């Protein structure tokens, strides 16, 4: 796996699923391929994205700044600085300075990532802030190692939280989660179907599914009524893809 592929993987792991994630993935690909060279416009675009947490925006802004060539005098962006200040906690800043001193002696991506993984996400974000604000300089490889370690820490806590929700025995939460997943799947089907003539059937199925979820929420249904909703939709989507000559593995 190449270095940039690894960075893209880690960064995307902390972005919530949805159309915005696909858009961010495309921007990262363009940036890493050297196709997007307007850092100013890229940062403005990032700043106005909804849904993303300030820290996720800060990490993405840091990655874009590391990768896109820019004039030396280009202003640092406030939204990135604020996100990478470790919540203003002096404890985080002390640890960030110690980590920075270690990273300065490191030259490899994996070495930097290994060192960084023993620090908290707050200290890692503060260390990124030091580098972003030009208070310290490390090689791009080392900076990317720091980014990936931070993303791994965040993704770990997100995964724990997700696992708790999936494993919950509360039928109401499970019911709502199944309806949310069905609704999201229907939305994705509509986007994939596009405007081809054969898409009408897939669009119809997706539309009916969304209406059904709305009705279930409006009238309040038994928690078990949502079982299998998403799987039914995915089967319809695969049948549609087969007719279109597209062979894909199951999405589950």
From Swiss-Prot:
UniProt keyword annotation of Aminoacyl-tRNA synthetase present: no
UniProt motif (Nuclear localization signal) ranges: 101-105
Topology in the lipid bilayer: Peripheral membrane protein
Spans annotated as Membrane-binding: 1-164
Annotated Gene Ontology cellular component terms: host cell nucleus; membrane; virion membrane
Disulfide topology: none
GO biological process, one term: viral budding from plasma membrane
Keywords carried by this UniProt record: Host nucleus, Membrane, RNA-binding, Viral matrix protein, Virion
SMART domains noted in UniProt: Flu_M1_C (SM00759)
InterPro entries with a match to the protein in the record: Flu_matrix_M1 (IPR036039), Flu_matrix_M1_C (IPR013188), Flu_matrix_M1_N (IPR001561), Flu_matrix_M1_N_sub1 (IPR015423), Flu_matrix_M1_N_sub2 (IPR015799), INFV_M1 (IPR037533)
Highest taxon, organism lineage: Viruses
Gene3D superfamilies (alphabetical): 1.10.10.180, 1.20.91.10
Stretches for region RNP-binding: 165-252
Signal peptide coordinates: none
Location(s), subcellular: Virion membrane; Host nucleus
Note in the entry: Most abundant protein in virion. When expressed alone can form virus-like particles in transfected cells.
Family to which the UniProt record says this protein belongs: Belongs to the influenza viruses Matrix protein M1 family.
Oligomer status and interactors: Homodimer and homomultimer. Interacts with NEP. Binds ribonucleocapsid by both interacting with genomic RNA and NP protein. May interact with HA and NA. Cannot bind NP without genomic RNA.
Designated name of the protein: Matrix protein 1
Originating species: Influenza A virus (strain A/Swine/Colorado/1/1977 H3N2)
Organism taxonomic ancestry: Viruses, Riboviria, Orthornavirae, Negarnaviricota, Polyploviricotina
